[in-house]
């Protein structure tokens, strides 16, 4: 039998698989007997991060943060997220509240072989994160809260009507014209996909029971007792955040008074610091406050905190170099494959 040879005029390309189209949703039966939908993206040897998205988000909302996917992989961070009750493709169970969800999350982490885990909550993910870390505080490596509810913020009654959100879910996600998210190519389009997935993945006529329950839990459930938490905590807030104002951060700092804490308050920024400073959150997960993400001259650097003021005074900015590109700059052209 003749040996198989490459065609004499063939170019060899490096591609051997499909490129990612966002996190892959998996399902597993956990200890309670319930089936959970989850994502698990990253190597087994990477730092595990449990991600809890904002109010009404599905497990694929993490895709909105994958504009820094290569940076996350370079740092070596594995992301696990568990879809909340009745959202996305998860079946609604009226018996599943904050504590039941927390138990299912820990059961899944046990199955995945994850012991110590960093926990990140964005916005409406805050109360769920509190229930999770209160259940097993000794297994929390670090806690990261990005403009996260401690309890239902005041002045949000009009925003938290499930039927109103269901009538126009995209409006729930609408960012101001000056928001930094508009600098991220494709972000607004991806937001529309997430908004509709959150409410209509099971069909147009399925009632928004999961979202309704979440809104009720925000109002009725007090912040869990976190006095047993010893892991370092990192808080990220915009000083101009009107949806989750700084008073909410104060509730967290009081509840976590016994922990080492880093507060990152960004002047004049609003309810989008979770995107604009996602790179810093990743760095804090990896280095536990030991590095600041900053860039200058098109180069991203991880500097020590003591150098931050001098670096910024010399023309640097916080964040990866992509944030230095003008918002109206055209997309970078595809550079083409490297053939050999």
Protein language model regions, located:
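Short beta-strand/loop motif that positions the catalytic acidic residue
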Residues: 229, 235-237, 241
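Catalytic active-site module of serine/aspartate enzymes centered on a nucleophile-bearing elbow/loop
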Residues: 259-340
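Acidic catalytic loop of the alpha/beta-hydrolase fold
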Residues: 239-244, 272
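Conserved HGGG/HGGXW glycine-rich cap/lid loop of the alpha/beta-hydrolase fold
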Residues: 34-89
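Alpha/beta-hydrolase
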Residues: 163-224, 315, 319-330, 335
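Flexible "cap/lid" loop of the alpha/beta hydrolase fold
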Residues: 143-171
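Conserved hydrolase catalytic core segment
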Residues: 116-154
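Conserved acidic catalytic loop of the alpha/beta-hydrolase fold
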Residues: 100-117
